[in-house]
Amino acid sequence: MQFAFDNSFHADMQGFYAPAEAAKPSAPRLLAFNDALAERLGFDRRGVDADELARVFSGEELPEGAAPIALAYAGHQFGHFSPQLGDGRALLLGEIVAPDGARFDIQLKGSGPTAFSRGGDGKAAIGPVLREFLVSEAMAAMGVPTTRALAAVTTGERVERERAHPGAVLTRVASSHIRVGTFQFFAAHFGADHVVQLSDYSIARHFPDLADAANPHLALLDRVIGLQCALIARWLGVGFIHGVMNTDNVAISGETIDYGPCAFMDRFAANTVFSSIDATGRYAYGRQPQIMHWNMARFAEALLPAIHRVSPADVEAAKALVDAIPGRFRAAWHAQVREKLGLSTSAGDDAELIDRLFDELEKHSVDFTTFFRALAMLLRGEGAMMQALLPAPDAMAPWIADWWQRIEQDAANPLDLADAMDAVNPLYIPRNHRVEAALEAAEAGDPAPWLELLEVVRQPFAARAGRERFAEPAPADAAPYTTFCGT
């Protein structure tokens, strides 16, 4: 299989990575390949069979032009600074430039130990690999910025975690793997010269329009803050809980990265947590905006040497950007919710309507995803879906009446609004009980349920006959759902 590698990070950023080599798997076998993404990247699959794909995307066979490296980074993990983390179980094969000119990293995740493994085996189990493949594809289909999955390959080996699991390797595609933690590593260990170099590279790669700004490093901070505000608003809009929002899991590209213990909320509760390692609820659904703010403050701290070098006065400007984050996020969030509610204009009392909505959803323990589809059905004159969803006929009645009044202010066609709402409010998400059942089946050797679920979540908005069960939340008496990071 031919790759047109153009490895700018390897060539331009020496000292920011360590050479790496993939472990050779005993019997690689292709589980899934993302043909649509491969086409987007300009890969030519003609004449390439599943065995060759398995060899390449397990790390057994190095493609021509690859320059495998493991990237260095640090990070705040649950609020505590770890000065050296890095790619402990992943290697960057290289970069390709797609036909449209976009540049992407091609990374193998679970490919064996690196210089940053800190005693770990560098491997991945099949469950976390298939979870990231599935959820990242669902997020992409819902329009949420995200890394993507190109391939999943089993290795023929067992990986020891709490018990032995089949080993696997994920091929991840990202605009880059530059993280907030990347800046933190070089700010902590090497100082201003390296931070300036990393910032200059990041601007050239991701945001070339910032190069002519009065202070490009300050402009980078501003841009990344804007992307993160928009990203977290999108997460909240689909009920997504990342689970481990450490600074090493924040990509400056604004893409969702490192799915680990992620999950989706069923019944709305702002304090929802699924991750087994988040005992204090630091990364709960409703705390994600505050954590984003905290992470961006850490990014600003790491960038300060570069910002100060151009203009010492801009240090105060950086502080002002960080202080303004809550307002910027709230604007992004309100715009997101207005879209979900079918509101085509902005009105002064929208903030109160939105805040009351989430109070009501929590009070009545309403399924978050289904509610917005039921709301659209009201615009079509059909109330059965909403009646079945709410615990009592008059539950949320005052709020719904106020929403109707607000809809009428926009003077739009209700049927057109309903269609617009259905185009942004997913019907099918990776429901946790469905994900778990699919992963258990795949680990037992039956990938069919996982493949079916993948097909469903890749088309999240349009209702399809025979797929009704995928829109249903977990049974009310289901045990609490817990996720694990898989490392």
From Swiss-Prot:
It is an enzyme of class 2 (transferase). It holds the Pfam family SelO. The active site is at 248 (proton acceptor). It catalyses: L-seryl-[protein] + ATP = 3-O-(5'-adenylyl)-L-seryl-[protein] + diphosphate; L-threonyl-[protein] + ATP = 3-O-(5'-adenylyl)-L-threonyl-[protein] + diphosphate; L-tyrosyl-[protein] + ATP = O-(5'-adenylyl)-L-tyrosyl-[protein] + diphosphate; L-histidyl-[protein] + UTP = N(tele)-(5'-uridylyl)-L-histidyl-[protein] + diphosphate. It comes from the Bacteria. The gene is ydiU. Nucleotidyltransferase involved in the post-translational modification of proteins. It can catalyze the addition of adenosine monophosphate (AMP) or uridine monophosphate (UMP) to a protein, resulting in modifications known as AMPylation and UMPylation. Its cofactor is Mg(2+); Mn(2+). Keywords: ATP-binding, Magnesium, Manganese, Metal-binding, Nucleotide-binding, Nucleotidyltransferase, Transferase. Coiled coil: none annotated. Belongs to the SELO family. Mg(2+) binds at residues 249, 258. InterPro entries: SelO. ATP binds at residues 86, 88-89, 109, 121-122, 172, 179, 258. GO terms for molecular function: AMPylase activity; ATP binding; magnesium ion binding. This is Protein nucleotidyltransferase YdiU. NCBIfam families: PRK00029.1. It comes from Sphingopyxis alaskensis (strain DSM 13593 / LMG 18877 / RB2256) (Sphingomonas alaskensis). Signal peptide: none annotated. Its EC number is 2.7.7.-, 2.7.7.108. Transmembrane segments: none annotated.
